[in-house]
Amino acid sequence: MAKVLFVVPYAKYYLNFNRDLLESLVRDGHSVTALAPDTIVEDTLAAIGVKFVRVPIRNTGLNPLYDLRSILHLVRIIGDEDPDIISCYSIKPVLYGSLAARLANKGRVFVNITGLGYMFMERTWKQRMLMPIVKTLYRQAFRHCEGAFFENEDDLQLFTNIHFIQREKATIVNGVGVNLTSFRKPSGRTGKAPVTFILIARIIKAKGIYEYIEAARILKKKYPDIGIKLLGPFDVNPTAIREDQMTEWINEQVVDYLGETRDVRPHLNSSDVFVLPSYYREGTPKSILEAMSMGMPVITTNTPGCKETVIPEYNGFLVPVKNAAALAEAMERFILDPGLIERMGACSREIAEQKYDVHKVNSRIRSVMQI
């Protein structure tokens, strides 16, 4: 049996995204340890048989002294744990975890590119300044890893084009997958007016929140009874939306903000159409996969990570980024023809079963990692 160590940016989000993988490894007798900066789900991890070790990693910003401390801390922990396999997720855990593994001379290293995020979006002066450093660190990380997992072809193509990684080391997986049993189509959804839309995401600009609000304004002038829901936590991302801005939207009665939840299923169950107008460099948004598994049509953008989940006119619609008018037009299709909700929703479930079953995704990952 193998000793597997995961280095992740937030244990809370990692558990939500990858619980099935962790449970399958523990169930098969492997020793599993998770390293992360947040301790909020330590007890939950322990309950499923996963050891937790806190490691000081700041997932945003660049502080050379603090980051050096993080790397040295990782070197010590990896040396103490002596894992057979080290699997790193997201930017800093990939960069620092792989370097620490090399310095500790322990384990086979796999990196997981779950989207490119903030650094590969719009280029601010700060991003332009940091990018050469990030590229150098990425090249070092990939040079010494045994394999890399990507969630869409665009990200893989970018990383091979700029010579971060050799194609033969890379594997494309269909996101983190979705548990088709836990997220299944409920009974009782009628698809009748008024139609209710829901967006589930971190409350950051790059998830298309502003476009969603503007589309809601456009539609509510014609259809005041439609439901416009928004669910998700506030964030510290550089494009985070402030709570006072949300209060303004709530007072305007343009959106029903539902806050944060541990279980999105009741909210999906009470909604008709899932919307994610993101221009964040996604991997494959799990929120979309969960909605698809529950038999919901999807409106999202023609961007890497999002566009792969929708076959236009089959299980939903793709719209241009930062285009509230086009988004409103796509949303209106379901208002004018509510029958699309049931038909396209059934197609979403079909795609989820064929392509995004979490057990198939995890089997692929474990096969590559040989565990």
PLM-predicted stretches and their roles:
Residues 326, 333, 340-355, 361-367:
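A short, well-ordered alpha-helix in the C-terminal region of glycosyltransferases
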Residues 297-300, 310:
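Short hydrophobic beta-strand element within catalytic cores of glycosyltransferases
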Residues 36-40, 200, 227-241:
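Glycosyltransferase donor-sugar binding loop
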Residues 53, 135-185:
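Donor nucleotide-sugar binding/catalytic pocket of nucleotide-sugar-dependent glycosyltransferases
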Residues 311-313, 317-324, 333-339:
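Conserved acidic donor-binding segment of nucleotide-sugar-dependent glycosyltransferases
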Residues 269-283, 296:
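Acidic donor-binding loop of glycosyltransferase active sites
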Residues 15-20, 195, 199, 204-221, ...:
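A conserved mid-protein helix/loop that constitutes part of the nucleotide-sugar donor-binding site
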Residues 232, 241-260:
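Nucleotide-activated donor-binding/catalytic signature segment of Leloir-type glycosyltransferases, i.e.
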